[in-house]
Amino acid sequence: MRVLLIHAKRFIYRTRMKAIPEAEDINGVQGEGSFENALVVFTTVESRDTSNPKEVVETAAKDIVEIASKVGAKTIVVYPYAHLSQKLAPPHQAKNILAMLELEIKKLASDKFEVSRAPFGWYKEFELHCHGHPLSELSRNYEAKTTARVEVKKKYYVLTPEGEVYSPEEFLEKASPEFRAVIEKEALGKEIGGVENPVNKLCAKFGFEWEPLSDYGHMRYEPHATLMIEAVGEYAWILARSLTIPVLKVKGTNMFDLAEKPVYEHAALFGDRLYELWADKKHLVMRYAACHQQFSMLKDYVLSYRDLPLGMFEIADSYRLEQSGEVTLCFRLRRFYMPDLHILARSVEEAVKIAEELQKIIHREAEKLGQTYYAVYNVTEDFWEEKRNLLLELVRRDGKPALITVYPAGIYYWVVNVEYHIVDSAGRPREIATFQFDVGNAKRFGIRYVDENNKEHYPVIIHTALIGSIERYIYMVFDAAVKMERRGQTPYIPTWLAPIQVRLIPVNPSSEQQLSHAEKVASLLERHLIRVDIDDRQLSLGRRIRDAAREWIPYIAVIGDREVETGTVNVTIRRTNDRVAVKPEELLEMVLKDLEGYPRVQSTLPRYVSKRPTLVYLEKEVALE
């Protein structure tokens, strides 16, 4: 908060016209005023004041009263003035803080001074006659030393599919090792430290790297990583479209104005992990999911009860200011891609029904990778007490006990917030997929639908990331590979996600016949949008086969003179370690079977390996133990 204090012989103001839509109702404060011997406090409320307004107001009021006493003023006038800083608080917050300041000054000194406040958000004319003594013109800058934090008291339970309720401590002996790890971390505060995570090595091996010229927690995506990011994004959309409800796909911006009340209120609920910036005198927040953009669109739609349920999907360019010491490749990032799906439902009961389809997809996609989810249900106290039957229905669908965290009602926008955790190869619970039942944001953003009686209602909004963020899904894929190797299997990634799906290796790259055969096979595969390349480098066959294995290519096909004569290729299949001689059409069928139900994304690399520069990240030898 910045203030300019003028000790005035005379001060007169009159409101002229509204300056902003959020202007204060002048019926509540004086629309005009005339004062003699007044300390006029020209006051700018800044964005930083909103983190702990109580401390700022108390500090400012105490100082203002002391100054008024020193100069011998008869009246203190709090006068909103937006010109002392470029970093303004949102209007609705500034208005509240100015009212708090007026009340605090009255509380401290109503027996000594008259206290008045001019209306906020108006253009005003004023006349000022300054005394001109040494203390008649002063400026002050008030800042909270601490950020106000409200400690949220939580209760923890374990709820079984049979409806039994346990304390976390009671259930530990019954829990599987993986669920025990979830309970210990989430409910008992036990952290696993000092364990090197082999998944980080795989992320780096496939070209997921930190960008040293950016902020902490920002990644760059090399060609292999870029392909994987694009493929997972396409797959997330395929899953959204597979739902039995209509889903719209949209795109939007990545920053929103905190001066807008719904944006500010939603951000305040999110907490202190916001990326904020100032531009053109505006205080902006980088979005942390797709909520702002999708809700801004949905508020403009004309919605009937017949339109619901209705989904909206976007891959949101998302930003969260995670602590620099906690960022982890592909998992905890400051900038990431979130395939965010929001579904409008008519009621919480309808949302529970819709969630059945979501839960099936969430569990199925983890199981495809050989992973198992363990659920943490964050619920409000009123939902826990009054709608436990609905909660039990959700837990029964998961098919295993769930950890329940009960929060006081009314502090968040959701009544149910479900986190699905895997326990990774380092023994740490990792949240991947999620869904929530949101009962607050429809009203906050003005999203309405009309029922069969032509009455308006606010829908319940389901938030879900069916496979988590794109990077976290890839983390889960790599973690599954680490677990494979520990079981004695050859680690692999699914064919649809492999940057190169087939590599053709002529035994003699100088042989026109072998190279021609490889090119014909490549053309056949490419016509079906299969990612294939040809290793035509003048290196030994053994070296080129090892390089292909280092890239975890699912199908490595060697072509020699015999293959040219017989019209075949000699294929090594990574997943099974089988080696087979097949016709090109048979190889095509093998790959197409792997790709059934998955996206086809064009390669991010040249067809010929000889045309690549040296990709340093591929040269790394990775031991997963």
Swiss-Prot record:
Its main location: cytoplasm. Zn(2+) binds at residues 291, 342, 463. This is Threonine--tRNA ligase. It is found in: Cytoplasm. GO terms for biological process: threonyl-tRNA aminoacylation. The N-terminal domain is an archaea-specific tRNA-editing domain that hydrolyzes incorrectly charged L-seryl-tRNA(Thr). Catalysis of tRNA editing is performed by the charged tRNA itself. Belongs to the class-II aminoacyl-tRNA synthetase family. Catalyzes the attachment of threonine to tRNA(Thr) in a two-step reaction: L-threonine is first activated by ATP to form Thr-AMP and then transferred to the acceptor end of tRNA(Thr). Also edits incorrectly charged L-seryl-tRNA(Thr). Its EC number is 6.1.1.3. Residues 1-149 are annotated as: Editing domain. It catalyses: tRNA(Thr) + L-threonine + ATP = L-threonyl-tRNA(Thr) + AMP + diphosphate + H(+). One of its GO terms (cellular component) is cytoplasm. Its cofactor is Zn(2+). HAMAP family: Thr_tRNA_synth (MF_00184).
